[in-house]
Amino acid sequence: MEKKFLKVGNNINFKFNTDGLEYDLIPGIVYNIIVDRYTDTVSLQESGKLPLPSKVYCTSRDERFIDKVINSYNLSESGFTGVMLAGLKGSGKTVMAKMIANKSGLPIVNIDKNIRPHILRNIVEMLGDTSVCFLFDELDKVLADYDDSFLLQVLDGSDTKGKHMILFTCNDDSEISEYLIDRCSRIRYWREFEEMSPSLIMEVLNDKLNDKKEVKSLTDFIKDNFEVCSFDNIVSFVKEANNYPTTTFEELFEDMNLSSKGTIKPHARSCKENNHKNVKNKLASDDYCWTVC
């Protein structure tokens, strides 16, 4: 099969001329789209592999969903297998998108907010029968300035010779075009991300909390007080708890960029009572100094 790309340094160009080395896109490698702002000429630039945390927290339901997406793509004959991962910010949507992209075994093309939809359509045309996984993070942030008619054309597959996967994430699905919702031919799978379950919270705490005796107490504190139980918020709070082992959960919470469900419900830490007294005495002194100053 004739190669469709040329590599010059780190840039991978569509084969419009004979300069450079012939090149095939590499499975698992991320390519950023480079667009000449004067000519709209498109090239791709290698960007390594998608970074993932050393440990990914994944439920059996998550694993079944990922396997289903991959299997459906493999069974498809042409066009796009579209996936929308929507919902709570900081809940792991981007991590799951990266996991799916890596598991697809396809070259990964990153679409950022600067790539206009007509450019995406042109890329799909130029790819021909070369299959890739497109990754479009936080789609909802760009749709206000985005002509989604081109995106709809792309997802309809009218210009597609090969078969592709396209992964979207969004925090606010109310911003998504009505022409994408309940249209499985365009977006086959739609997964809503909500708060972490108590069992998953406890698993994270068992891994990351230094004082394992506090796992149950901190799990209860999170369930009772966190307005947004996202992975991002929980991991950040655990770091604070590890860094300040004699500070109450309530004080840690009050000082962080976290919203509460209402009046904070205290839960005891496992540190010694005299440590609590020392902290309270220090806080009283600090508060007095702050007031006087």
PLM features: what roles do these ranges have?
Residues 134-137:
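Hydrophobic positions in the central parallel beta-sheet of the AAA+
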Residues 1-30, 183, 190-293:
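C-terminal alpha-helical "lid" subdomain
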Residues 64, 101-130, 143-149:
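Short glycine-rich substrate-engagement loop in P-loop NTPases that contacts/grips substrate
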Residues 45-83:
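Pre-Walker A (pre-P-loop) alpha-helix and adjacent loop at the N terminus of AAA/AAA+ ATPase modules
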